[in-house]
Amino acid sequence: MATTVPTRVMNVIQCYSPPELHRGPIMNWKLIQLFNKALISPCDLATFKSVNESAMKAGYLVHPDCCGSSEIQKFLKNETFNPNSTFYKTFEEVEAKGELELLFDQLMHYASTYGTNHTQEGNGYVPNDEPPVIEFTKYKVILPATEEEIFEECYGMLKSGIAINEKTLNLLMEYIKDYHFLSKVDVDEIANKEAQAIFSVKTGKYPNQAISVLRVLMYLLTEDTAMLVKSKQSITRLKMIVEGMSSDERKNLNKILKERDVVLSTVFYRYKPIILAMKCSETSTVINRIRKLAVKNHKPMKVGFWERCFNPMDKTDAYIKEAKEKVDSLTAFKKAQLMQGILERINGQDTEGRMFVVRNGKVYVRAGYKPPCDEDYLFELYDVIKDSYVRNLSSKAITKVETKDAEDNVVVLERPTRIKLPKGVDLTLPTSEKNFVGNFPMGSSVVLAEKDNVIGIYWRNDWGARDYDLHLITKNGSHYGWNGDYHGEEFGKIIYSGDMTSAEPEAAECLYIERCAPNSVVAVNKFSGSANSKFKLFVAVDPDKNDLQRTRELKDAMVDPNKIVFEAEIEHDSNDTKNVVKIENGRMIMSNFGTGGHSRVPSVSMSKVIEEQSKVKANSYISLEELLIKAGFELVEEEADIDLTQMSKNDLIKLVC
């Protein structure tokens, strides 16, 4: 399908005079995804036109000063997707078919994919053999940046204190090393301790604090964790690693210990099993010296205030006083974690058991656990932390603007910072970069329209998986998706688009959901794929349409890409089922955690086990909008100082930190 170039873009193309051509620098395309910026890389007019023709098919426009990089093309290839690459062309088509017709179509499809061992070209038999392509009318913009500006973005993220996903951390480090900015990085300024440890190992720049040094050594040896765990299993593993090291590796370990023997002696007694596990012929002398120095250098461990503040016993006044004294030293992300933890404690006080989303994204349920809850004290503590969070935001809620007075003198005035939020999406406070779903903090929600809501997944074979399955399980136990119903009505209409088992070149599965449909969980299962695969989750909402009208108006399609209000790439490293959305009281609440199961269809019993605690968690996320207003920001729908409608993950991190 031909792409119509918008008039405003044609004006830029016709007026564009490219600078002197030179080979543009290379920046990993995933950093473009992270920052919505690309390194300055000029091009000729033909390249500018070609790049933006590709960009518009993905819903983007690329500034002429950054069109010359090959990484832009990789970025655009990844971002281009057709949400209408579904089994059936319209939801009406699904509704019109009987159960036997639906089954026959699916069996024909399976025979052409699994039945031929995927030797047939393309997606096999699919009724929607020519998926409709709908042009974008709204575009995100990729802007140019200097090498120094991209470094500041990377370094700012490291200093923010947010817990950073290791893959993101590797991207940041790669850029800082490749563009020779290492000398500008102070490792002690990297606020997140795990990120600090990984950065130190991979760059050779070490921190000064004792526990930070020990974390670095732990990651250096294990290559997968900086956590200081003293369990028998962990110590045994550490000893085996040291025993298996080469002579050069042991000498390097000895060198690091020797250079930091005094500082490590201050924590020797606290982490004695870990340090002794590093003992070998090359390190025995220095470890013995650390042990002797510990006699005079030992610093007793004090349990941190914030680790014990939820259980004050009868010292509530003293705890509140101490909280007020210490709260401003916390990062914004630690404050958000504490506030969310307080709300979970309060909202879950009448429930038995607790649900924890652990580091690998799996869910752990502690049955029968019921922590103490002093509601009055916890609300007071919550207000102390919230007030500090708002004070921090308030420093960014004032914008200075230059104007002229009656005598033509330049004067500087202050006004509230104008901020534009995504329409129809309620953003939550970010607690960790690991707890983002795409560019949105976990718990962010989409407000459902009365009728026209579509949630879907999209993938390609070359993303690591042939066959993903989209499922919806209602609170009543009804199941929609593969091996379940294709359509039905439980207070509101639910329709499934059909099962795709190959994505060559691409595939999508969708669910049509009305607002009055029952509370439900939407899950994604990987039926066939490798460990390092991914899919794109998207939500489209059209409040102006009713009862599938838009399928006729949009060339018989299921999804209008211009109505997509949420999209996120989600990595699926294991074979468990991922719960990606909780539908609760007219909202789609975004999540991303595995159930830990290995069944091909999500277990209804598992859903019931985590249902109660999922509801507690869903009701404990904190709205960003409420705190922005309290801090003094002005919410606008037009021209804004801060526009989060096209936000990158980094934009939100910079706003709150």
Stretch-by-stretch model annotation:
Residues 2-251, 255-657:
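Intrinsic-disorder/low-complexity signal
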